[in-house]
Amino acid sequence: MKKTLAFVVIVALSITCALAQSWQKVTPANECTNRHENSLTAIGNKLVLVGGRGVKPVESFDIKTNTWTKHVETPLEMSHFQAINYKGEMWVIGAFTGGYPHEVPIPDVYIFNIEKNEWRKGPSIPEDRRRGAAGAFVYKNKIYIICGETDGHWDGTNAWFDEYDPKTDRWRRLADAPHIRDHVGASVVGDKLYLAGGRRSTAKIQQVLNLTEPAVDVYDFKTGQWSTLSEAQNLPTKRAGASSVVLGKKVLIMGGESDAQEESHANVEAFNTQTMQWEILPMLNKGRHGTGAVNVKGKVYTVAGSGNRGGGPELNSIEVFE
């Protein structure tokens, strides 16, 4: 009986702690550009907003001063990607350019230095591995891209996994993920990569939003092996174009779009890598897809995105989970 009561108390405390955190609207001193199919990363205390449909400026939000600063425009249209911070610079890799439904993979990596306010072209992506709507991340000073699509929203969803070593300027192909998916974000906790969400965009057969992938795939860097979690551990709310971010030992899947509803999803679900279970967190104030999320000193921020499935309305609002 005592053990049962103790368990109930622990669960109650966990729920109370989760509910104590909530999404707050941030009101900046000035506004940024409305955009979607963009990405977001953090450099120091700044949120760096980049890309989207059309050519747009890079913009950074200083958390301390609550102000936006406008930087130079992107060298070309950049959309559908997961920007990363590599040694204090922002890298754009696994992105699209051009219009729907035949967006074209950007063949090169582009790197933005916020201090110099300038772009430079980085390494070329191997020709037969170019795609957009891919996940990207850094692990032990190497850069990775995972899954994506080769022909815009038309066709070519894949499970490719590639590693780039900036030190040696070499690419390496790794084992394909168990499931093909695009419009996916990647998150790493410890030595494991977690993939949740995404879909198989296939406009050539009028199947763009509805072929969502519920399974969670995990890559163990120590063993070099993929695994798929049980069906009971599937993503609770199937969607694509969601943001993926790490908070402690949890992977948060935020927002997204699907054929289930017109409005973008406001759902925030966290996969606890210690209990190996999903937790339901408070919803966003405004559902959104086609953007990113970052963790800055234990607070999760998201900016911009699309308020409905598809291409609009474009947002410029900021929310923080604290």
Language-model features: locations:
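Positively charged n-region of N-terminal signal peptides that target proteins for export
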Residues: M1-T4
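Bacterial N-terminal signal peptides
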Residues: A6-T16
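Kelch-like beta-propeller repeat domains
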Residues: A20-E322
